[in-house]
């Protein structure tokens, strides 16, 4: 029985990590691509923050994306603040952390912008603000943006990046799905263009509502596009999903996305679509 109680020390005898040396390695020196697994020096990332091997787009803050996407921009509705209708424990602290991390008042930047010289109403969701979750005021900002675009007869471009509905706001969060989609339907009824760009991750209630309503739907390479999480599905069907089941390429293959666009090509592609797809007869 002593044999089974013997401690395995092979790794301790043959692989000894130098803890002091590890402490000398600067934080953030290396990056690992979550899609292909490539490890590379972080300095290889440019403003687009894409993997040098597979073109996976690392997550960006709304302001990082705004910096290379638009020549001009004007933020709208920046005074709208998140609400706490359920007085959820620690929610205010999460909101404060999200504000500090992103410089935004909510999980979405909204405003007027010029992309390749084309004027548009623009919304960019920020995955670093409570995972880009859809809260009551997130929905309010999106709805006001779309309604203003309808009134001014402007196209709308929305970049989605979200973990879904914000659980800390309960039913108030879920109501935003219908609210935003209704605004989109009125926008479309006015003969105006609505473009969506799906980025990593686009999931949950956002996928089930305004992310799926685009006249034209683009997606970034290898972005996660899903409704329920992988573990939830696997535990329900008692089967393991294919590795790429919730990737943009698979969603494209099944007809729910029109095209996958590399980040370096997004500005040019959107400018072309806005120029020719967003033209309106006076």
UniProtKB/Swiss-Prot annotation:
Q: Which Gene3D superfamilies match?
A: 2-enoyl-CoA Hydratase, Chain A, domain 1
Task: Write down the EC number.
Answer: 2.1.3.15
Q: Which GO terms describe its molecular function?
A: acetyl-CoA carboxylase activity; ATP binding; carboxyl- or carbamoyltransferase activity; zinc ion binding
One cellular component term from this protein's GO annotations in UniProt? acetyl-CoA carboxylase complex
| UniProt keywords, alphabetically | ATP-binding, Cytoplasm, Fatty acid biosynthesis, Fatty acid metabolism, Lipid biosynthesis, Lipid metabolism, Metal-binding, Nucleotide-binding, Transferase, Zinc, Zinc-finger
InterPro entries (alphabetical)? AcCoA_carboxyl_beta (IPR034733), Acetyl_CoA_COase_Trfase_b_su (IPR000438), ClpP/crotonase-like_dom_sf (IPR029045), COA_CT_N (IPR011762)
| Pathway the protein contributes to | Lipid metabolism; malonyl-CoA biosynthesis; malonyl-CoA from acetyl-CoA: step 1/1
The yes or no answer to whether the keyword Zinc-finger is present is: yes
Instruction: From the Swiss-Prot or TrEMBL record, state where the protein is found.
Output: Cytoplasm
Q: What class of enzyme is it?
A: transferase
Cofactor note (record): Binds 1 zinc ion per subunit.
Q: Which residues bind Zn(2+)?
A: 33, 36, 51, 54
Tell me, in a sentence or two, what this protein's role is. Component of the acetyl coenzyme A carboxylase (ACC) complex. Biotin carboxylase (BC) catalyzes the carboxylation of biotin on its carrier protein (BCCP) and then the CO(2) group is transferred by the transcarboxylase to acetyl-CoA to form malonyl-CoA.
Which family does the record assign? Belongs to the AccD/PCCB family.
Would you tell me the protein name for this molecule? Acetyl-coenzyme A carboxylase carboxyl transferase subunit beta
**From which organism does this entry originate?**
Lactobacillus delbrueckii subsp. bulgaricus (strain ATCC BAA-365 / Lb-18)
């Amino acid at each position: 029985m002593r044999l089974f109680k013997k401690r395995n020390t092979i790794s301790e005898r043959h692989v000894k990590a130098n803890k002091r040396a590890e402490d000398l390695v600067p934080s953030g020196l290396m990056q690992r691509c979550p899609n292909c697994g490539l490890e590379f020096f972080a300095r290889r990332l440019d403003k687009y923050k894409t993997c040098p091997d597979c073109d996976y787009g690392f997550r960006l803050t709304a302001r990082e994306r705004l910096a290379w996407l638009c020549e001009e921009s004007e933020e709208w509705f920046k005074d709208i603040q998140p609400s706490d209708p359920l007085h959820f424990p620690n929610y205010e602290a999460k909101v404060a952390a999200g504000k500090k991390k992103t410089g935004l008042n909510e999980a979405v930047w909204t405003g007027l912008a010029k992309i390749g010289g084309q004027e548009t109403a623009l919304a960019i969701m920020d995955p670093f603000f409570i995972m880009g979750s859809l809260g009551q005021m997130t929905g309010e900002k999106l709805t006001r943006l779309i309604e203003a675009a309808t009134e001014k007869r402007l196209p709308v471009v929305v970049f989605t990046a979200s973990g879904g509905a914000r659980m800390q706001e309960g039913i108030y969060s879920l109501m935003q799905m219908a609210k935003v989609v209704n605004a989109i339907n009125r926008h479309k009824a006015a003969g105006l263009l609505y473009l969506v760009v799906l980025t990593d991750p686009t999931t949950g209630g956002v996928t089930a509502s305004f992310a799926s309503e685009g006249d034209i739907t683009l997606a970034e390479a290898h972005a996660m596009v899903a409704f329920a999480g992988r573990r939830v599905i696997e535990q329900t069907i008692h089967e393991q999903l294919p590795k790429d089941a919730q990737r943009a390429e698979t969603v494209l293959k099944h007809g729910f996305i029109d095209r996958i666009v590399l980040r370096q090509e997004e500005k040019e592609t959107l400018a072309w679509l806005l120029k020719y797809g967003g033209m309106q007869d006076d």
